[in-house]
Design a protein with these regions (language model features):
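Non-globular, low-confidence helical/coil segments that flank catalytic cores
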Residues: 2-336
Length: 336
């Protein structure tokens, strides 16, 4: 089941050596963000990739204390999670997601993948389905009794929306040439705590690869899911890591990060959130593998876009320039 990538570790080390330091380089780009701050692997100069029509991009939308990630390439788009952080009837996160997608001219989503059933990941899903043409909806198939999830499943059935359950070992049908989307978790028999399948631990974890660049997207996967992935796959090395569970101490263990060895870490969390995300423990762990100028947080940076042409990758932030001095401070104000 494990797959080997030729000299990936050495490629990443070379990228780190010749990467430019974020915060010192700011390049004006003709793009959505106006200014691009970034790191580039494989080149000695900053090359804006956001507007390269053949590049692949991960967009982490600043939608508050939740998740919504947009994938894009060649004018085709897909959404991973569509959360809502407010109580029903107050739709601030939904509006942030809509504003972002509309600014890019998105009309169709090739797929909507919901990593798990929590409100901060699916609360805006029905609204997304009503507003955009969605090809297929994926989730993990875990039974859940929340009204939000029940309403979603009813909507999918009534509107005859294509729906598929994915588990470890599956591949998402990629709408983009050269892009592979592999499901690493949850396991087929799921992860249980007591008599119930745990919602966070059964998050869909994706390994997205384009050329020599790999993204690891972890939803709210926690320690047991990380242990399962470590025990199942020999190679989970990735260039870009989407931190699990909004930077919670329940995720991003040292052992997991040692296997991933991320160069860039992106964290989705709301400003002044009630959970203290990101917690100090994962920040300490991230700092052992990369530097603050390569760790990005939506509560500080706003929307974050990581773009690759398959060899090089760059990072753009809405609140440019990226302020690395604020990154390694937890949501509770504790500094690494």
């Amino acid at each position: 089941m494990a797959k080997k990538r030729r000299s990936k570790k050495s490629q990443k080390q070379m990228k780190k050596i010749i990467s430019l330091i974020l915060g010192l380089i700011v390049v004006v780009a003709v793009g959505f963000f106006g200014v691009e701050s970034g790191i580039i692997g494989g080149e000695s100069s900053l090359v804006p990739l956001v507007d390269d029509e053949h590049a692949f991009s991960l967009h982490m939308i600043d939608m508050g204390q939740g998740d919504s990630l947009l994938l894009s390439k060649d004018g085709k788009y897909a959404l991973i999670d569509a959360g809502e952080t407010m109580s029903p009837g107050e739709r601030e996160s939904r509006e942030a997601i809509f504003a972002y997608l509309d600014s890019l001219g998105v009309k169709k989503l090739e797929f909507l993948l919901l990593t798990h059933q929590d409100y901060d990941h699916i609360g805006s899903a029905i609204d997304v389905l009503k507003r955009y043409d969605v090809g297929v909806v994926y989730d993990n198939g875990v039974e859940h009794t929340s009204k939000t999830y029940e309403n979603l499943m009813t909507y999918l059935a009534e509107e005859d929306v294509s729906y598929k359950v994915v588990r470890d070992g599956d591949f998402i049908s990629s709408p983009w040439s050269g892009v592979s989307i592999e499901v690493l978790s949850p396991p087929e028999d799921l992860i249980y705590k007591g008599k119930k399948a745990d919602v966070n631990e059964n998050s869909i974890v994706l390994k997205v690869t384009y050329g020599e660049t790999t993204y690891l997207l972890t939803g709210d996967a926690e320690t047991e899911a990380e242990e399962y992935i470590l025990s199942t796959y020999a190679d989970i090395d990735a260039d870009i890591l989407k931190a699990g569970h909004h930077g919670s101490s329940s995720s991003s263990t040292y052992a997991f990060l040692k296997a991933v060895t991320p160069d860039v870490v992106v964290i989705s969390c709301g400003a002044d959130n009630d959970y203290g995300h990101p917690h100090i423990e994962p920040l300490e762990n991230f700092a052992k593998f990369t530097t603050a100028d390569k760790i990005f947080r939506t509560d500080i940076d706003g929307d974050v876009v990581v773009t690759t042409d398959g060899t090089e990758y760059s990072v753009a932030v809405r609140n440019a320039p990226h302020d690395a001095s604020k990154i390694l401070i937890s949501g509770n104000g504790v500094k690494v």
